[in-house]
Regions:
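Sec/Tat-exported extracytoplasmic proteins
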Residues: 51-58, 62, 66, 215-219, ...
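C-terminal helix/juxtamembrane-tail motif
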Residues: 3-4, 28, 236-257
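Hydrophobic-cavity lipid-handling domains and compact docking modules
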Residues: 26-191
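Cleavable N-terminal signal peptides of Sec/SRP-targeted secreted and luminal proteins
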Residues: 4-25
């Protein structure tokens, strides 16, 4: 299980929606942003292009619309409690002051919408995502005890991600219709994950170097054990963010005819 407290966390898929939500109350999108209409036969292709363009335009933020820089993204805390007595990995981890870097290098490869069923699907590729912050940790990895407190750096290389938003229509006073995201599914598929935990075993340099080597030599096993916790928790976060957007802006403004 993983618990996350966040200040500002947006994945590349949500950037375009975030812009719409921020400027939807009486403002127009900047001319530099691509607009997409449901009547366009190439609507999905337009949205894919719009998201990819917005990623670059918002790298340094958009102060006039109250949008913070997207590079890096900040997360307050993440707590992970993963595994059981018979699991190859049993860990209790707590991270603070987290910075997610290089998300703005993401590229949306596929983008599909079914607005009648209120489903949005996307696939993205990111050359590298770096997760850096302060950590405390104790537990067991592949039968080896592990403990430490210090700086951590976890990097996902050549990450392919799949996103599925499942919504339902809600109507508010005045007849305006909004899309409520009731489920957000995420799947991460990195080609490599590297770990660097400083100050393991109370600063024992030799043991720390050995444990980091074990983690990196067995990254697939380690990531596989932690994957569901990451995916479930980030899906929860992204659903919460999406609903803060979709429940503020009517569908006909997010997806104009």
């Amino acid at each position: 299980m993983m618990v996350v407290s966040w200040q500002f966390l947006v994945l590349s898929l949500g950037i375009w929606f975030l812009v719409v939500a921020r400027v939807g109350a009486g403002k127009d999108l900047p001319d530099s942003f691509e607009k997409c209409h449901r009547s366009d036969p190439q609507f999905d292709s337009c949205l894919r292009s719009a998201v990819n363009g917005a990623i670059q335009l918002l790298k340094d933020g958009l102060p006039e619309f109250g949008i913070m820089p997207l590079e890096p993204l900040a997360v307050d805390t993440i707590t992970i409690n993963q595994g059981g007595p018979s699991a190859p990995i049993t860990l209790r981890q707590h991270f603070t002051g987290i910075k997610l870097s290089y998300l703005t290098n993401s590229t949306i490869l596929k983008y599909r919408t079914d607005l009648k069923k209120l489903i949005i699907k996307a696939e993205a590729i990111t050359p590298k995502i770096q997760f850096a912050g302060n950590y405390t940790m104790d537990g067991r990895i592949l039968l080896l005890p592990i403990t430490g407190k210090g700086k951590a750096n976890i990097t996902l290389h050549r990450l392919k991600s799949h996103h599925e938003l499942i919504g339902e229509l809600v109507e508010r006073d005045g007849g305006e219709k909004f899309m409520y995201i009731r489920k957000y599914l995420v799947h991460f598929d990195p080609k490599l994950v590297t770990f660097d935990f400083e100050n393991l075993f109370n600063g024992d340099a030799a043991l720390g170097k050995t444990m980091n080597q074990v983690l990196n030599d067995n990254w697939e096993v380690v990531f596989q054990e932690l994957r569901s916790a990451y995916e479930d928790t980030f899906g929860y976060i992204f659903r919460k963010i999406s609903n803060q957007i979709f429940l503020k802006v009517p569908m006909n403004k997010i997806f104009p005819e």
